[in-house]
Curated annotation (Swiss-Prot):
HAMAP family: Hfq (MF_00436). This is RNA-binding protein Hfq. It comes from Clostridium botulinum (strain Eklund 17B / Type B). InterPro entries: Hfq, LSM_dom_sf, Sm. Homohexamer. Belongs to the Hfq family. RNA chaperone that binds small regulatory RNA (sRNAs) and mRNAs to facilitate mRNA translational regulation in response to envelope stress, environmental stress and changes in metabolite concentrations. Also binds with high specificity to tRNAs. CDD domains: Hfq. One of its GO terms (biological process) is regulation of DNA-templated transcription. Keywords: RNA-binding, Stress response. It holds the Pfam family Hfq. NCBIfam families: Hfq. Residues 10-70 form the Sm domain. GO terms for molecular function: RNA binding.
Length: 77
């Protein structure tokens, strides 16, 4: 019962982070940010963009597009 179940969002972001895959994050303002995911939690994503670290609130994100497709295989379970 203590086992935490991963959701698609966590699997997606964790795979992008582990593989250091470049992503484009689209914000609700229409702004685009390119970079690599360094970490995330329930409310935020840490992105490295051109050598600068950004803390982006998930409620401001509309879309995350990876450079290559991400496979939805949860190898940690």
């Amino acid at each position: 019962m203590n086992k935490q179940q991963n959701n698609l969002q966590d699997i997606f972001l964790n795979s992008a982070r582990k593989n250091k895959m470049p992503v484009t994050i689209y914000l609700s303002t229409g702004f685009q940010i390119n970079g690599t995911v360094k970490g995330f939690d329930s409310f935020t994503v840490i992105l490295d963009s051109e050598g600068k670290q950004m803390l982006i609130y998930k409620h401001a994100i509309t879309t995350v597009t990876p450079e290559k497709p991400i496979l939805f295989v949860d190898n940690e379970s």
